[in-house]
Amino acid sequence: MDEYKIVITPDAEADLNELDEYISFHLMAPDTAIRCIRYIRSKIAGLRKTPKRYSLIEDEPWHSRGIRRMNAKNFAVFFYVYEKYNEVYVQNIIYQKRDLPGILSERYADLDESD
């Protein structure tokens, strides 16, 4: 079985940086931030072998675009699998207690417009 290449998009990197800053400076817990980021990255690395074990998001327009969700403790990792090149694109990493549908609608607004 081939492994998938993991591509972390600039948006996902920005999410990780925002998370790091929030935990490090707002919560004053830099060691916790390091552990949290490492954990999320290790979960993302696990997508190399079986990314399709995670379900597609049921709601549109994300479902028809192949967007999947993986939970990493208190965070939702959104990604899609690009079979043609055996790649997994990590799109966003969002704290699960936030308004996920609202945030996704904002971040993926261009998906609705492209139809």
Model-derived features with residue positions:
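Basic/aromatic recognition patch in beta-strand/loop cores that engages polyanionic ligands
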Residues: T50-E87
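Basic, Lys/Arg-enriched alpha-helical interface segments
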Residues: M1-S64, A109-D115
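Enriched for short, Lys/Arg-rich terminal
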Residues: L27, A72-A76, Y80-D115
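Basic side chains
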Residues: K43, R53, R68-R69, N92, ...
